Amino acid sequence: MTAPLHAGLEVCARRLTPESPAPIAIAFSGGGDSLGVLLVAKAWAAACGRPLVALHVDHGLQARSSDWAIQAQAMAARLDVPCQILRWEGDKPTSGLPAAARAARHLLLAQAAREAGAQVLLVGHTLDDQLENAVMRGAGAPVGPLREWSPSPVWPQGRGLYLCRPLLTVRRADLRAWLVAEGLDWIDDPANDDIRYARSRARLSLDGAAPLAPSPDIRALAAACKATPWGGFEIGRAALLAAPPPEALRLLQAALACASGAPALARPARARDLV
């Protein structure tokens, strides 16, 4: 068994219930990451008999997007997984397009997953996505770390729906190597390499980089942060002052977001006002 498949199955074994009759939904763009998570889901479901449904969002932002939707549906069919195509209709914004597309995608996926009776949506984020988020946070973007298990970010359409990321510890290169070994092709969206977008620039800056382990200062800072019964946070002053300033600032951003219930990290300037 390959390392990506083993890692994904281990997460599924911990997070998913084999006995449930509800289908497992998979966000399936047809790209390499989502194809990897579809293979993991297929292997896990084969052992317990749970039904699967793939959901493909056609954003309509590329000239070939309709062709990609049909291609993704055919890819899923070859794995005996039904695939529903969802389309982002209406006018598209001229600014803030990535954020608007992401919000529309989450909304469409949540609606379709719940209509299918699914309570879990598998998403193909990898360790590279986690690293890209860290680079973007360092540049001031209000993006938090990805979680293996988290509630749908849309409300009320995503009520009762959870996102599971089985490949969050897997490097994208290792995942692609597995797909190549299986003789599988995937869709490459040129937008992933468009440096007009912050994530593409972060991806380019990380090309070939190894993941960094948390430093002792970061681990001490995490240990010094405790949630209170009333919904706030207590952060040890000594650990906060001893931590590298960028990491201390990001902890304050996250604490503000959690305590306030905001959907994204607080802006750096707001967090700096606390210190």
Where are these regions (language model features)?
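Short, structured loop/turn "capping" segments at alpha-beta junctions
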Residues: 185-188, 212-217
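AMP-forming adenylation/ATP pyrophosphatase catalytic core
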Residues: 5-30, 53, 88-90, 153-160, ...
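Extended, highly charged alpha-helical segments
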Residues: 201-215
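Core alpha/beta nucleotide-donor-binding catalytic domains of modification enzymes
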Residues: 1-205
